[in-house]
Design a protein with these regions (language model features):
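A shared catalytic/ligand-binding motif for oxyanion handling
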Residues: 1-126
């Protein structure tokens, strides 16, 4: 699909998506908003829980999670966009960076959930 001049992006701090009702309502809301890219922070997923995050029309879902139900970030890229992934860099729940291309134009998308204290120093280390 050819996209226009703009790419719509939504970013949300979801404060956990382990509850099925919250997850389903969130998925319905995202489908109605219809962005190209969605960033989620504070998903509270563990690596073994990521299969729970499903949205119709969004097969490209990338996570960074720790072993405890805290922090966690995700990047969702809509199927309506021809995004080609080159590299993915992530840690244990605070950031994920995806380098790729859209219509042969390089793009980098990053989702960072920094601690409340020392955020500038944390981000400079990423």
């Amino acid at each position: 699909m050819v996209i226009g001049t703009y790419i719509s992006i939504i970013t949300l701090s979801v404060s956990g998506l382990n509850a099925p009702t919250k997850r389903h309502r969130w998925a319905e809301w995202i489908q109605k908003q219809d962005p190209y890219i969605c960033f989620l922070q504070v998903t509270h997923f563990r690596p073994r829980d990521t299969y729970r995050l499903k949205v119709r029309g969004w097969k490209n879902i990338f996570h960074a999670n720790g072993n405890q139900k805290k922090a966690g970030v995700a990047i969702l890229i809509s199927d309506k966009m021809d995004f080609k992934i080159k590299t993915i860099t992530r840690d244990k729940g605070n950031y994920i960076v995806i380098k790729g291309s859209i219509q042969e134009e390089d793009i980098t998308v990053a989702n960072i959930y920094a601690p409340n204290i020392g955020a500038p120093q944390y981000i400079s280390k990423c």
